[in-house]
């Protein structure tokens, strides 16, 4: 494989996460504008966006088998066509039903592309380089989560209608398409053929890592989704200031991924997993207990930094449980992580309604604590099973 081709494939992986990040973050940001457009309440609109998460969930689930039937290149080209259809559908649709279908299609595209992006990195690189590149890939999710809200805010400020945000997001997939048609995917044909021939044995750590992925994502999104309301209603902080908490979290999250992508090669991944989950659990607890807004800003920035590498370390550790990680193994972790995303509002909304915002944040903190204990269990189980 030529170096230019390897770079092109790596950038497809980077942009696959950027596409998903932009979709998820922007969709939440313009919820109020869309609800006004369709004359619905925000609570009704939040249920509609379940279609986006459902699309991601379904596509990651089926992609484990799809990857053995349809080549990666064809999947990416077909996904580009679906993106065009969905974006045009969003622009032209005048009913919430059609909007929901288009969001589901974008979810399907997002899940397939992110799954392919992760698969590419795990098969192009090995060892510590794999971990570093996975962290760098994941950082593009946060990067687009920072850039696109700025773009969206600019568009809304200029009184440009909300669906132009989705047209801008579609431009990311145009770049993926251009890279796809100019790249060779021959290496992956032999990899998927080998994974069919070799029956992969998964150890107990794969199950523990899958549960860790679910609980971590559920805990993270359950926390960060309700922080603005918590700061406004419980801390009595101005709504404009609460935005700095979320943006500070994602900015430090992105910087943390860049930092850990360089230093991860010098540390044992299992011990790093234990350290980061313990620090994140403590920092989240400190944030919830703090009554000073300035302290909360420092704490949430630290939380974003220390929690940034956890999900990628989970994926990397899962890929190291077997000699040749198959698409099914990687997709299993992504599937459980996506289930965590899907369950976020299904689980947290009733808690907010019944027990309030404080208990909801404590629930997220408990989930982080469980992931910390699972990281210790995974470490000792690794030693018992003799995994490298």
From Swiss-Prot:
One of its GO terms (molecular function) is transmembrane transporter activity. Coiled coil: none annotated. One of its GO terms (cellular component) is plasma membrane. Belongs to the major facilitator superfamily. TsgA family. Keywords: Cell membrane, Membrane, Transmembrane, Transmembrane helix. The lineage of its organism: Bacteria, Pseudomonadati, Pseudomonadota, Gammaproteobacteria, Enterobacterales. Pfam families: MFS_1. The gene is tsgA. InterPro entries: MFS (IPR011701), MFS_dom (IPR020846), MFS_trans_sf (IPR036259), MFS_TsgA (IPR023528), MFS_TsgA-like (IPR050375). It is a multi-pass membrane protein. This is Protein TsgA homolog. The chain crosses the membrane at residues 11-31, 50-70, 77-97, 101-121, 133-153, 160-180, 206-226, 244-264, 268-288, 298-318, 332-352, 360-380. It comes from Buchnera aphidicola subsp. Acyrthosiphon pisum (strain Tuc7). It comes from the Bacteria. The keyword Acetylation does not apply. The keyword Transmembrane applies. It is found in: Cell membrane.
């Amino acid at each position: 494989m030529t170096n230019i081709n390897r770079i092109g494939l790596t950038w497809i992986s980077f942009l696959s996460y950027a596409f998903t990040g932009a979709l998820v973050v922007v969709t939440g940001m313009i919820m109020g504008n869309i609800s006004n457009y369709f004359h619905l309440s925000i609570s009704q609109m939040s249920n509609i966006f379940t279609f986006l998460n459902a699309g991601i969930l379904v596509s990651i689930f089926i992609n484990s088998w799809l990857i053995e039937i349809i080549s990666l290149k064809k999947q990416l080209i077909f996904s580009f066509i679906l993106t065009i259809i969905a974006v045009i559908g969003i622009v032209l649709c005048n009913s919430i039903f059609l909007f929901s279908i288009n969001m589901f299609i974008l979810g399907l595209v997002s899940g397939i592309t992110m799954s392919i992006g992760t698969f590419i990195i795990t098969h192009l690189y090995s060892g510590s380089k794999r971990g570093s590149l996975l962290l760098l890939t994941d950082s593009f999710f946060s990067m687009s989560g920072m850039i696109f809200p700025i773009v969206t805010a600019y568009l809304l400020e200029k009184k440009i209608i909300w669906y132009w945000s989705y047209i801008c997001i579609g431009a990311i997939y145009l770049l993926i398409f251009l890279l796809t048609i100019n790249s060779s995917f021959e290496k992956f044909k032999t990899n998927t053929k080998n994974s069919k021939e070799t029956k992969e044995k998964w150890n107990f750590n794969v199950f523990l890592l899958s549960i860790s992925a679910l609980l971590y994502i559920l805990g993270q999104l359950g926390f960060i989704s309700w922080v603005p309301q918590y700061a406004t209603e419980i801390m009595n902080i101005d709504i404009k200031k609460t935005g700095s908490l979320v943006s500070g979290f994602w900015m430090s999250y992105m910087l943390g991924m860049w930092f850990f992508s360089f230093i991860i090669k010098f540390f044992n991944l299992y011990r790093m997993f234990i350290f980061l989950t313990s620090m994140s659990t403590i920092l989240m607890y400190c944030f919830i207990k703090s009554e000073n807004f300035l302290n909360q800003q420092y704490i949430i920035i630290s939380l974003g930094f220390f929690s940034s590498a956890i999900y990628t370390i989970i994926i990397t550790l899962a890929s190291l449980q077997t000699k040749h990680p198959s698409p099914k193994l990687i997709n299993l972790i992504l599937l459980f992580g996506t289930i965590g995303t899907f369950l976020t509002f299904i689980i947290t909304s009733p808690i907010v309604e019944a027990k309030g915002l404080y208990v909801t944040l404590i629930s997220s903190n408990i989930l982080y604590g469980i992931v910390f204990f699972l990281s210790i269990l995974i470490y000792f189980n690794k030693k018992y099973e003799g995994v490298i």
